[in-house]
Amino acid sequence: DAEVLKELLKEKEEIQVFFDADSQVMPSCTTYNICGRIPGKHPERMILLSAHYDSYFSGFQDDNTAVALMFGIAKSLMESGYQPNNTIVFCAMAAEEWGVIDSDFDWSAGAYEQIFTAHPEWVGKVIADLNFELPALAHGTRARIRSCYEYVRYLEEFLSNLPLLTQAYPEETRITAPIETWSDDFSMAIAGIPSMVNDFT
């Protein structure tokens, strides 16, 4: 279909297309969050890396790229033999795009269930959730990290010590707060876990 559209657009600047989608809601389905960990020297303290693997359409940008990024970090850490101070937990979340029927707030259900049902004991142990969302989205010459208020000053200091990042994003590299409701870090934040995400808005 894409090739047909490309050919048609060679002849005209604008074309009209009709999209006919057949989608079905299947209630009472089970989804699974997939987690792994690299044990740290202080196993009672954890850093959570999260991304979601469910998607609308093909999901390359939202959010399979983030899952691949997260797994790449895990693979590199394991191959290096490095033992972190804090246990690092990697969690590929389900049901971020949609997971609740008959609600105005139907997204981020997998992360909500992860922290409020499956692992409420993480609260007080996870010192930070680094959530990855749409990391391949081109922002041109600017980059932002969206964070909870408590980590803004720390992250600003951290960014000031990364001159290469400033070169990569000369227009702007900054921290913005607060966390928004659009991604899984929100569920972690409302549970009391300090959270941050690459800003994609």
Regions found by a protein language model. Give the residues of each.
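Extended, hydrophobic alpha-helical segments in both membrane/secreted and soluble proteins
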Residues: 47-49, 53, 63-77, 86-95, ...
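Metal-dependent peptidase/peptidase-like ectodomains
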Residues: 3, 44, 93-197
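Soluble non-cytosolic domains of exported or imported proteins
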Residues: 26, 60-68, 82, 105-109, ...
